[in-house]
Amino acid sequence: IKLIAQGDMKAFEELYNKTDKAVFGFIFSILRNKANAEDVMQDTYLKIIPASKIYNPQGKPISWILTIAKNLALMSLRSEKKTNTSIDELENNIEFSQKDETEDKLILNLAISKLADDEKQIVILHSSGVKHREIASFLNMPLSTVLSKYNRALKKLKKILEGD
């Protein structure tokens, strides 16, 4: 982050390459719309450059980035006056980035959409490479709660997928 503050675009590119999947997954879990999530993701990374000058390295950079992303995603929701999206709306709004996506991935995405919001965020963040401790810190939950919600979500996914 210090290198980015000094104008090092290679450091910025490296940060982007290491965090883009987790950031997009997290934003998408909030907005539930691919196009809006892409817009907020772009805004997040654009905000990182000037904000890097005031970055306080007390925590992990991913937590800082996800905080920026969360704030921008919530601002986006407020501007659209969307406060609650039903699961039916969520399933109708899911847009997939590739037409050649496998049927298994489609089924998994639908199964994940049936999880509670906090479970969905934990599963998406962890599958994007974010450690449970970082998720706990970011979501302001005890580690034990994150672990139990993650395990409960996996059991729900297994039940959903075996039922289909």
Regions found by a protein language model. Name each.
Residues 75, 81-105:
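Internal acidic/polar
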Residues 5-6, 32, 43-60, 79-80:
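Sigma70-family region 2
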Residues 102, 112-119:
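Short helix-coil-helix linker/hinge
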Residues 50-57, 67-87:
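Arg/Lys-rich amphipathic alpha helix in sigma70-family domain 2
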Residues 122-123:
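A short pre-motif secondary-structure segment
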Residues 5-14, 24-43, 138, 143, ...:
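Short, charged helix-capping/linker segments at alpha-helix termini
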Residues 25, 39-46, 50, 59-71, ...:
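Structural recognition of an alpha-helix C-terminal capping motif at a helix-to-coil junction
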Residues 74, 133, 139-164:
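DNA-recognition helix of helix-turn-helix
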